Amino acid sequence: GEFSTNFTDITPNVEFFDVYSPPITSKYADVYWTMMPEIPLSKEIVSRFNNKVMAITGYEMDQVMVHPDGTEEPIPCFWSYNHHYVSHLQGANSKMIKVENKPKYDMWEFSHGHESYKFITINESDTPNNIATSQLFSSANGGESRGSFHGYPYNKAQLIHSPKSFYIQPMQIDTRNREPEYINDKSQYHPGILPKSNKAPPTASYSG
C-alpha cells in the first residue's frame, strides 16, 4: 500500500513541546563535543506524565539563536556545522552517571584517543510492565537534518515512563569567520584560516 508523507494522516492529534539546550559559545575552529548539564522538562510535562507513559512518535532538531524578545533565528549552517548529536530523555526511575572507561585495545589512540570516561543510564527502580525509563534520539543526526521532522510509522512509538529531563551531547564545529567584514554575513560562507590539507575549492559555499 501507499505510505502517506503527511504525518497527521499517520498519527493524528499529536502534541509537541520544545526543549532548549544550554547556550553554546565557541571560537573559530572550535569543536564543541561534550555532555551538557541535565535539562529539566517543564513542570507541566513532568506533572502530566508522572507515573504515566509518554509515547513519542517523532521529533526534530535545529540550531538557533534565541533573541532577548524570545524569537528564534536559525544559525547559518556555515557558521556552526552540526556534525552529529545524541540526546537522552530520562525518566524519573532512571539516572545518568559518569563512569571510568578503560580502553580495551591500543588502537583507540589512533582514532578518537583514549576515552577516559563515559556516560551510562541506570534504572533505579522498576516500572509497570517494564516500560522504558529512558530513550535515546540520534537518527539521521547530521547538519543536513536540521528542521527535518523524524516521524515514525503508524502505531509505532518510543515509550518512556515518567519523563523528567534531557541530556544532550552535541558535536558542533565553529566555521564562522570573525573578520569584521564577514562576521555578521548570513547570506554566504566566507572561509577563515584553513589548513593546507583543505580540499574545498576557493569558491566553495561550505567549509572544507
Short names for language-model regions:
Residues 1-208:
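A long-range scaffold signal marking pre-active-site subdomains of enzyme folds
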